[in-house]
Amino acid sequence: MVINPSLIISTLNLGILAILLGSIFFFSKSYFSNENPSLPINKAASAHLSINNKSEAIEYNSGPFAMAILKALALLSVISLLVAINTEFSDINITLSLWLNNTPTNISLNFIYDQYFLIFLSIALIVTWS
């Protein structure tokens, strides 16, 4: 089986974007609720509970884990950028309309990976990590 460099680049970039999209939900700062539960809450090493008069907030400190994820994603984006530079990569167009065809409207997602996107993604992840 021949490994195509464009396949490596598209797989790395789709993985980076999926992890970034998933991290929106897992690395949020706090969750608010107006209820006052009577059950005791166990404290984890990365979470603490603060109670105000009006609301209760459970805050999660996921800083070190989020920074490690950003470091790994920055490294992966630099690897995909170096593969693209070494193979004289031009661009890839990935269309995800076949996966979303069960809806009454036509939904089509197009990802265009060119050198500008690869440079932007690498710089953005390195700046966010630092």
UniProtKB/Swiss-Prot annotation:
Catalytic activity annotation: a ubiquinone + NADH + 5 H(+)(in) = a ubiquinol + NAD(+) + 4 H(+)(out)
Single GO molecular function: NADH dehydrogenase (ubiquinone) activity
The EC number(s) this enzyme carries: 7.1.1.2
UniProt source species: Mesocentrotus franciscanus
Transmembrane annotation, as ranges: 7-27, 65-85, 107-127
Locations listed in the record: Mitochondrion inner membrane
Function: Core subunit of the mitochondrial membrane respiratory chain NADH dehydrogenase (Complex I) that is believed to belong to the minimal assembly required for catalysis. Complex I functions in the transfer of electrons from NADH to the respiratory chain. The immediate electron acceptor for the enzyme is believed to be ubiquinone.
Family: Belongs to the complex I subunit 5 family.
Signal sequence, start to end: none
Topology class, membrane: Multi-pass membrane protein
GO annotation, cellular component aspect: mitochondrial inner membrane
Protein name: NADH-ubiquinone oxidoreductase chain 5
Keywords per UniProt: Electron transport, Membrane, Mitochondrion, Mitochondrion inner membrane, NAD, Respiratory chain, Translocase, Transmembrane, Transmembrane helix, Transport, Ubiquinone
Keyword Protein biosynthesis found: no
Entry keyword Transmembrane: yes
